[in-house]
C-alpha cells in the first residue's frame, strides 16, 4: 500500500472562528496568524494506491468552480488535482473510489469540473464511486442555517445524476485494511478513514481534529455545528489514537501534516511529528 499526501491549495480562515472560545493569547502560541487575524489553512487530500484493484482518493479540496463566491477566503497556491495525479502516474479515470469526509466546499470542490465553453459540470473521476454518509448527504440537500453557505449543489449533483454516489449509514469497510468510521459534531456523520498498514494505522482526521493545535478536546472550532458532540467525538478518536499509537493526518494544518498523540494524565497532546 502506498499513501501520499497531496496539498491541493491554501486559504485563510479567521483565527477566532478556527479556535472558537479559546482566547487568542492561548491559540496564537500554537498556530500563527497575520495582522488581520487570518490563519493559513491547507486543503489536504490523500492518495492511497497499490491496493488490489483500488486507487482511492480521500477529499479533493475546493476546486475552482466557486472561487469568486468564496473570495473572502483568499485562496492561493491552488493545484490542479488531475495534473497532480498524472505526475504520480495515475489518470483520473483510474481512480476507483473517492471518499469525502463531508461536503463542505473545501473538501469536495474538485469532485466535479466545469467546461467553461459549454457550462457543463461533470464528474472529475468518471469511473469512481464517491463515498458519503447518508446523514451528510441529507444535510447537503437540506442544510441547516449554519452550514448552508458551505454547500454548493454543483459539487455533487453530477455525481448523483451519474449513479456514482454511495451512501453509508454506519461504519463500513471500504476494502481490506481501510475502514470508514462516522463521527458527528462538526457536521452530521463525517467520514473518517482508518488506513491499516503493517505496524501502523493512519487516521485521516478531517474536521474532527483539523489541526495539530486542535488536539486538546476543548479547542473546538466555531465552525462546529454541535460543539458538545464535537468534544465527545474528539475524545473518542484521541483515546484510541493515544492508546494504539495511531498517526493522525491533519487536513487543514499548514505546518504539521501528521503526528501521533499522547495522553498525559487527563490531557491529550501532540506527540511525534510524522512524515509520509
Which ranges hold each PLM region?
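Active-site metal-binding loops of divalent metal-dependent hydrolases
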Residues: 8-10, 60-63, 103, 135-136, ...
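Metallo-beta-lactamase
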Residues: 64, 76-90, 94-106, 124-182, 232-245, ...
Amino acid at each position: 500500500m502506498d499513501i501520499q499526501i497531496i496539498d491541493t491549495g491554501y486559504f485563510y480562515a479567521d483565527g477566532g472562528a478556527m479556535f472558537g472560545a479559546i482566547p487568542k493569547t492561548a491559540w496564537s502560541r500554537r498556530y500563527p496568524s497575520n495582522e488581520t487575524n487570518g490563519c493559513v489553512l491547507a486543503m489536504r487530500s490523500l492518495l492511497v494506491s497499490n491496493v488490489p484493484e483500488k486507487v482511492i482518493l480521500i477529499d479533493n479540496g475546493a476546486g475552482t468552480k466557486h472561487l469568486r463566491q468564496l473570495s473572502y477566503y483568499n485562496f492561493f497556491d491552488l493545484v490542479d488535482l488531475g495534473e497532480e495525479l498524472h505526475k504520480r502516474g495515475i489518470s483520473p479515470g483510474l481512480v476507483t473510489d473517492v471518499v469525502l469526509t463531508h461536503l463542505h466546499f473545501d473538501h469536495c470542490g474538485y469532485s466535479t469540473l466545469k467546461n467553461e465553453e459549454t457550462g457543463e459540470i461533470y464528474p472529475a473521476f468518471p469511473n469512481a464511486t464517491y463515498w458519503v454518509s447518508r446523514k451528510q448527504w441529507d444535510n447537503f440537500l437540506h442544510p441547516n442555517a449554519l452550514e448552508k453557505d458551505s454547500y454548493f449543489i454543483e459539487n455533487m449533483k453530477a455525481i448523483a445524476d451519474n449513479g456514482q454516489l454511495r451512501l453509508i449509514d454506519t461504519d463500513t469497510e471500504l476494502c481490506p485494511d481501510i475502514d470508514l468510521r462516522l463521527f458527528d459534531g462538526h457536521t452530521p456523520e463525517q467520514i473518517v478513514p482508518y488506513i491499516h498498514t503493517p505496524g501502523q494505522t493512519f487516521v485521516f482526521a478531517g474536521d474532527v481534529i483539523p489541526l495539530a493545535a486542535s488536539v486538546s478536546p476543548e479547542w473546538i472550532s466555531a465552525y462546529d455545528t454541535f460543539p458538545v458532540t464535537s468534544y465527545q467525538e474528539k475524545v473518542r478518536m484521541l483515546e484510541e489514537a493515544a492508546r494504539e499509537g495511531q498517526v493522525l493526518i491533519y487536513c487543514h494544518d499548514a505546518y504539521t501534516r501528521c503526528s501521533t498523540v499522547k495522553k498525559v494524565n487527563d490531557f491529550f497532546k501532540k506527540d511525534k511529528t510524522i512524515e509520509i
